């Protein structure tokens, strides 16, 4: 901060070197609050100097949720019923939890069978192992239907 204060008086009176040095010693005491006020502007200048980094949105990562899909299924099943944000958050957490369990089980199955790839067969077996009874049967049939629809289109 002090070099900035020395440059200003020197620029005004280049012929007088000694008085400029004396003024430079006196100037920092009076100009320090101004320099401190300039710090946020200085940060902005640094930000503009790093235009690429400051221009990009650094903060928020995209968080993938199932909220849209939960809402669509709710409207298919019960068109007249709504859902609170807390209930939606619980449902989203539930689906994430089930997805993680299925993925972990499918990965274990692939490792046991010494296969490098998780296929629909591992997913189907994981569903049968993770989900209980009738729920597993319905999930397998819906999954098979979805896969055949996807491959046919």
Curated annotation (Swiss-Prot):
GO cellular component terms, A-Z: nucleosome; nucleus
Modifications made to the protein after synthesis: Can be acetylated to form H2BK6ac and H2BK33ac. Monoubiquitinated by BRE1 to form H2BK143ub1 and deubiquitinated by UBP26. Required for heterochromatic histone H3 di- and trimethylation at H3K4me. May give a specific tag for epigenetic transcriptional activation.
Family annotation (SMART domains): H2B
Task performed by this protein: Core component of nucleosome. Nucleosomes wrap and compact DNA into chromatin, limiting DNA accessibility to the cellular machineries which require DNA as a template. Histones thereby play a central role in transcription regulation, DNA repair, DNA replication and chromosomal stability. DNA accessibility is regulated via a complex set of post-translational modifications of histones, also called histone code, and nucleosome remodeling.
Protein name: Histone H2B.6
One Pfam match: Histone
Keywords associated with the record: Acetylation, Chromosome, DNA-binding, Isopeptide bond, Nucleosome core, Nucleus, Ubl conjugation
KW Disulfide bond (keyword) present: no
